[in-house]
Amino acid sequence: GFESPGLTTIMKCFTFIGSTPSVVVISLFSLFFLYKVLKHRTELILFISIIVGSPILNELLKLLFHRARPDFHRLIEINGYSFPSGHAMSAFAVYGVLSFLLWRHIPTRWGRTLLIVISIIMILAIGISRIYLGVHYPSDVIGGYFASGCWLAIAIWFYQRYQEKKFEQRRPIQSKK
């Protein structure tokens, strides 16, 4: 069908970008940027909890489902269970949390749109690369997006509740008349 040497090279690049070593480098750079450049402190806790929690959740789900990887037309070899895709979960976690944290620092609609478009492209390209390379079924990737999306939403919800309580504690107490 769609297989070609050039496309295979591109898909291997996206798979590499979604691999653990790349996610670690992207995460370390992001932590430095959030801390040193944007002077974020509490956001680091959110970022770390999402980035650390996503692979833990992935491993738990793989142990729960025990789904074998596709055994036909693999372009790369990999071991372990298939569902959910760890690359899809990592991509959704990293680019999702970065979009959430960077959104408020981008003043223009064009800049925000670019942030979201780049994030969506990276998330989709990494997931599609796993299907193309024959190491995941489409449902593995979709399940990875869903699991990571749930984890991201829960973590952001707790973070926002924490921020609201912190803000309420800083407000001066209004005297009753």
Segments predicted by a language model, with ranges:
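Membrane-embedded catalytic cores of phosphoryl/pyrophosphoryl-handling enzymes
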Residues: 71-177
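Hydrophobic alpha-helical bundle signature of multipass membrane enzymes
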Residues: 1-81, 98, 104
